[in-house]
Amino acid sequence: MSKKYPITVSSWTLGDQCTFEERVKAAKEAGFEGIGLRAETYVDALNEGLFDADILAILEKYDMKVTEVEYIVQWAEDHRSYEQKYKEQMCFHMCELFGVNHINCGLMENYSVAHTAQKLKELCHRAGKYT
């Protein structure tokens, strides 16, 4: 694996119509060194009946790593939905599980710089040891 910048296939590349193992195998066969994983794709793997240990075993079987976790949105909202709060925590768990030190986040809303800066500070505080 490239030490500094592993070649990573985006989680979106294979969509959501394949199993976790099919995703990892396809990425390996295509020459990628790592996969990006969305919180939704991780939950899909759990819904397949996989546990964290199973997911890690599949990654090891194909000599692959999760190198990117995504995607936190609506983090600057004053009143975030339960689903967004849970997804954020899921992303934090995934970072710990896979040893990933960053999360892709998006901001689709239009806020003032001051509001955005404050909400980013709060997000970083929630991320705690993952930052």
Residue ranges of model-derived segments:
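Short active-site-adjacent helix-start/loop capping segments
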Residues: 43-46, 75-79
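Active-site acidic/histidine proton-transfer and metal-coordination neighborhood
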Residues: 18-21, 25, 58-61, 65, ...
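A short, Lys/Arg-enriched amphipathic alpha-helix followed by its capping loop at the start of a domain
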Residues: 2-4, 26-32
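Hydrophobic faces of well-ordered beta-strands that scaffold small-molecule active sites
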Residues: 5-11, 35-37, 66-71, 103-105
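Short polar catalytic/cofactor-binding loops
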Residues: 11-17
